[in-house]
Amino acid sequence: MAPSRNGMVLKPHFHKDWQRRVATWFNQPARKIRRRKARQAKARRIAPRPASGPIRPIVRCPTVRYHTKVRAGRGFSLEELRVAGIHKKVARTIGISVDPRRRNKSTESLQANVQRLKEYRSKLILFPRKPSAPKKGDSSAEELKLATQLTGPVMPVRNVYKKEKARVITEEEKNFKAFASLRMARANARLFGIRAKRAKEAAEQDVEKKK
């Protein structure tokens, strides 16, 4: 294989009858068929639940490089479920993924996922455990007739881009230093506690000097 990208140029040392140790990939097409059959079998087994599994939350990708994009996460946090009014044990039984390790670090993410849960709950057709004795919250007989298995992801997460109209760049925007501003904001956030502590100590020393 030809070297790709900025990696080290390899010097392969072929000894010990290397032709018998070549990694082959002849099972690839059969493995593809096997995966497809497994997906179809699972879809039949869990019908009429969605074939792609439970609903996932909207999360932001980590690091500065990717945090402008959103994607589907692992599971909803316990706080999101509490605000949406869904018990964590009930959530898993009605096709909602739960991740107790996740923490909400912003109000926006919390509100977005709570709204997502409420929308999902409004669209959900819930089958009664006993058809003869439906409980509160179960769907009506008319709604049950409309139920079909969803094949794609449940409420897929999409990145929405808002196009801006072309306009003249202002002088203020030309003089604005984006990178320096971000670095300064990060430095201020990092040093906030240390600066507050130093200011408090300086104030205490001034009080002692006045005495």
From Swiss-Prot:
GO BP of this protein: blastocyst development; bone development; cytoplasmic translation; translation
Tissue distribution of the protein: Higher levels of expression in benign breast lesions than in carcinomas.
In its keyword annotation, does this UniProt entry include ATP-binding? no
Cellular localization per UniProt: Cytoplasm
Q: Which InterPro entries match?
A: Ribosomal_eL13, Ribosomal_eL13_CS
Q: Which residues carry this modification: N6-acetyllysine?
A: 16, 177
**Ribosomal protein recorded as keyword:** yes
Q: Where is this cross-link: Glycyl lysine isopeptide (Lys-Gly) (interchain with G-Cter in SUMO2)?
A: 123, 145, 174, 177
Give all Phosphoserine modified positions: 52, 77, 106
Q: Name one GO molecular function term.
A: structural constituent of ribosome
Record keywords: Acetylation, Cytoplasm, Disease variant, Dwarfism, Isopeptide bond, Phosphoprotein, Ribonucleoprotein, Ribosomal protein, Ubl conjugation
Pfam family of this protein, just one?
A: Ribosomal_L13e
Highest rank taxon of the organism: Eukaryota
Cross-link Glycyl lysine isopeptide (Lys-Gly) (interchain with G-Cter in SUMO1): residue positions: 174
GO CC terms of this entry: cytoplasm; cytosol; cytosolic large ribosomal subunit; cytosolic ribosome; endoplasmic reticulum; membrane; nucleolus; nucleus
Q: What family does the entry list?
A: Belongs to the eukaryotic ribosomal protein eL13 family.
User: Which disease is this protein implicated in?
Assistant: Spondyloepimetaphyseal dysplasia, Isidor-Toutain type: An autosomal dominant bone disease characterized by early postnatal growth deficiency, severe short stature, genu varum, platyspondyly and severe epiphyseal and metaphyseal changes in the lower limbs.
Q: How does it assemble?
A: Component of the 60S large ribosomal subunit (LSU).
Question: What job does the chain carry out?
Answer: Component of the ribosome, a large ribonucleoprotein complex responsible for the synthesis of proteins in the cell. The small ribosomal subunit (SSU) binds messenger RNAs (mRNAs) and translates the encoded message by selecting cognate aminoacyl-transfer RNA (tRNA) molecules. The large subunit (LSU) contains the ribosomal catalytic site termed the peptidyl transferase center (PTC), which catalyzes the formation of peptide bonds, thereby polymerizing the amino acids delivered by tRNAs into a polypeptide chain.
Q: What is this protein called?
A: Large ribosomal subunit protein eL13
